[in-house]
């Protein structure tokens, strides 16, 4: 069955590239989630405290890629204890988050985070909320690292390579 989940992993360029390489992911799109303004621009999200998170919309086939596995792969490319910071990127828009549209996904998300927490001394900082809003990012952000292969990314090439084999 095809499903959709929204994941914030810091800068959305790397998150989009990473998730798009995973077998079972059908499509990805970057945008802005769960902020306080409608139809924000990148400049507004970066400079005007809109509350939006840079987020990747992930459509996937859960018969090929169960949500549990998708979340485990997500945890491999973030620091789940870091608040509003991933790699060199800092700000509320770079927070980590799992935004669901299907309430049943909580039955998978919560135990997954409990397992993750056992691996860390610090508390897990991943925000888990129902998706309230998602606005597509500007076209130049879509598939950014495919268009700009040497563009900045906090997720390394090794992670991209392992995503292809996941």
Curated annotation (Swiss-Prot):
GO terms for cellular component: cytoplasm. Keywords: Oxidoreductase. The active site is at residue 11. Disulfide bonds: none annotated. The keyword Oxidoreductase applies. It is an enzyme of class 1 (oxidoreductase). Has an important function as a repair enzyme for proteins that have been inactivated by oxidation. Catalyzes the reversible oxidation-reduction of methionine sulfoxide in proteins to methionine. This is Peptide methionine sulfoxide reductase MsrA. The lineage of its organism: Bacteria, Bacillati, Bacillota, Clostridia, Lachnospirales.
């Amino acid at each position: 069955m095809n499903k959709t989940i929204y994941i914030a992993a810091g800068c959305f360029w790397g998150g989009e590239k990473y998730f798009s390489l995973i077998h079972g992911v059908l499509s990805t799109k970057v945008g802005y989630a769960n902020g306080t303004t409608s139809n924000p621009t990148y400049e507004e999200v970066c400079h005007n405290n809109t509350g939006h998170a840079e987020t990747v919309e992930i459509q996937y086939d859960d018969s090929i890629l169960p949500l549990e596995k998708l979340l485990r792969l997500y945890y491999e490319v973030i620091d789940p204890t870091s608040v509003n910071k991933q790699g060199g990127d800092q700000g509320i828009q770079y927070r980590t988050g799992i935004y669901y549209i299907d309430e049943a996904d909580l039955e998978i998300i919560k135990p997954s985070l409990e397992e993750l927490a056992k691996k860390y001394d610090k508390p897990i900082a991943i925000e888990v909320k129902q998706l309230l809003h998602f606005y597509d990012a500007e076209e130049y952000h879509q598939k950014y690292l495919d268009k700009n292969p040497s563009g900045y990314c906090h997720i390394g090439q090794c992670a991209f390579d392992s995503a292809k084999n996941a």
